[in-house]
């Protein structure tokens, strides 16, 4: 599966419902209709997109938007970012402050396991999980940030800061 096919699948469920749960239910139906090879390829693309977004700059944006962001929260944030679609995802990976134009990013842990769950249900094979979900990178790409350095955060993420933190200063 190439990126174009992956993003087409994500876009196909974007219009279904208002909540992330409704969108995931729609995505699950699309995944159920796929052959096993495509399920595996879809999961590989999820993992690829998660790693591509594993960046300190994006983590800083998530920290501002969520009022703090642990490792696990950042993982779920990145999954939610994927569910926002190709344009939002790609813009945020390059320039995280563009998320000021997007609004809330729902944490979306279920996306990380959905294709594996469909595969397991179909094949009664839980070993599929062992193939995926390994963090290949020890640390995110880019320069780390000090979550308490408000001057840096305000400078690096001016639009997000204005929306989420301006009242704090």
Which residues does each PLM region occupy?
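N-terminal, charge-rich interaction modules
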Residues: 1-29, 34, 167
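Residue-level detector of well-ordered alpha-helical segments, enriched
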Residues: 2-5, 22-26, 38, 42, ...
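Short, hydrophobic/amphipathic alpha-helical patches that form generic packing surfaces
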Residues: 7-12, 44-48, 52, 72-86, ...
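Long, solvent-exposed, polar/charged low-complexity segments
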Residues: 7-8, 13, 126-169
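A glycine-rich, hydrophobic loop/mini-helix early in the fold
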Residues: 29-68
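Hydrophobic/aromatic-rich, well-ordered segments within soluble, folded domains that form packed cores
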Residues: 63-93, 99
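Terminal interaction module
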Residues: 82, 110, 119, 152-157, ...
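An exposed acidic His-Trp-rich patch
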Residues: 88-121
